[in-house]
Swiss-Prot record:
Protein name: Transcription factor TCP9
Classification lineage: Eukaryota, Viridiplantae, Streptophyta, Embryophyta, Tracheophyta
PANTHER family xrefs: TRANSCRIPTION FACTOR TCP4-RELATED (PTHR31072), TRANSCRIPTION FACTOR TCP9 (PTHR31072:SF1)
KW Transcription (keyword) present: yes
Tissue expression summary: Expressed in archespores, pollen mother cell, ovule primordia and megaspore mother cells.
InterPro entries reported in the protein's UniProt record: TF_TCP_subgr, Transcription_factor_TCP
Chain's gene name: TCP9
Amino acid sequence: MATIQKLEEVAGKDQTLRAVDLTIINGVRNVETSRPFQVNPTVSLEPKAEPVMPSFSMSLAPPSSTGPPLKRASTKDRHTKVEGRGRRIRMPATCAARIFQLTRELGHKSDGETIRWLLENAEPAIIAATGTGTVPAIAMSVNGTLKIPTTTNADSDMGENLMKKKRKRPSNSEYIDISDAVSASSGLAPIATTTTIQPPQALASSTVAQQLLPQGMYPMWAIPSNAMIPTVGAFFLIPQIAGPSNQPQLLAFPAAAASPSSYVAAVQQASTMARPPPLQVVPSSGFVSVSDVSGSNLSRATSVMAPSSSSGVTTGSSSSIATTTTHTLRDFSLEIYEKQELHQFMSTTTARSSNH
């Protein structure tokens, strides 16, 4: 339902104002009420004035340009702690002016240095007047001049202990003496190559081999694995070198390592030169006397009976006979050992082929 309210102002005596309500019900406009009402002449129809809000004047204070107060510089003495430190000395203005003028004439950096110079030069007169002088307890005489140390004894002891901790061994200087020999061994293999001195009792073959080997290299015996145990690899055996007990490390890293080809060639040449000529025996009717001689001392002599038609034995020397006998027996034993290994290998191969 829509309601239409219509106000009509009627001019007349009573100045009545009628309100007409027009109601539309189902599309029909009807006038329901029409009632007059009195208008109060004292009431003004003018718009009411808006209330004025009180104005508050808020003025922001400008930021203060002055920050926190600066820390005042300390006027205390910053030198060695002595009796009387930090105390001001009051003197007449004429004395202060004379000291200031003397500082400029002497070229000192401060007035305190000038006062110290005055005390040092006036020390004889002070001693004559007082009997003791103005020498403090911590002052020292260096080349006839009194010196006051700027560091305490505790600081100097700490510095000395620190230097001692840094040093690995006793030293009388800050530098390392290259020519100084190290008394204790480090336990590591040396880098530089060293030469060994063979004693005169060493064998001739080992001497020749050591002389022909490259410097810094040592011979090694490679022993192959047994044919019966194929899983075990070959291992190397380093021969015992005769010499004094203070020899350097056996295995040394050469500074300039030689090539393997030169090492193999040197070993082959050494073995060729160390092998003596074969023994030549001429049959005779008597017996052959073979002696084992080491150097010039006769150790033992063995007699072997052998049928022969001539009376003579042709040998180079007794030492060559001993060496030849040793090599002959060694070659013979090695040959037997090789035959045994070959026989075992052949039997193993035959057994495997028969099983398959």
